[in-house]
Amino acid sequence: SLPRRPLKKTAGWGRSPLVLRLALAQRYRFEMTITDYSCCDFIEIFNNPEPLHEVNEKGVKLWEDLVLSGENIAATCGMDLHGNSSLHGHYSTYIEGEPEGDVCQEISDAIHHQRTWVCKGPLLEVHNDGEALSFTIHQTGKPGYEPLPEEDYKITLRTRDQLITCGVSDRIPLTSFKEDRIIIPMLFEKETIIENLVCTSPVIHL
């Protein structure tokens, strides 16, 4: 569980797996054609300084479409820092890790198993007991984020063919997902719009 394995915020990847940093910067038109996404280990779905709708929303949508089509790609975020800057109110990437663990190996394992969180503050943990999904929110104390009461959060569970919206206290039977085996969980404040997205959780494989 998360309390036994503390979550680490990644500040830099070092010698990282192969990353697709979505080339949609506002002032620069980088374009490329990728025919084999199996070569990519993760996609930077948020670059914090970039505009939400013009850039980052496209990154989120691309990642969702690839994952739900069966690609094993993790989600991360970034911040193009060229000096001192506040990270208050921005997304960060979190992974599970041990206090004295090998961070490089833990990052590699998290990436290759899609076990990353991209969040502004609260982390959404999803539990699968073999019959239903249930949920826990962990507040990280991240600077710039003011926690809400649990009932003010909404969760979406997106599959290839459906979108289920629920609350943190709900249990969602696995039979709700019909034939879908891949689920993307996200946590929102009050309303399930991208402006209110506070956490993208690890992909669930049933």
Language-model segments: residues:
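Domain-core and long-helix interface of multi-subunit machines
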Residues: S1-G89, G130-E131, F135, T156-L157, ...
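C-terminal functional module detector
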Residues: S69-A74, M79-L206
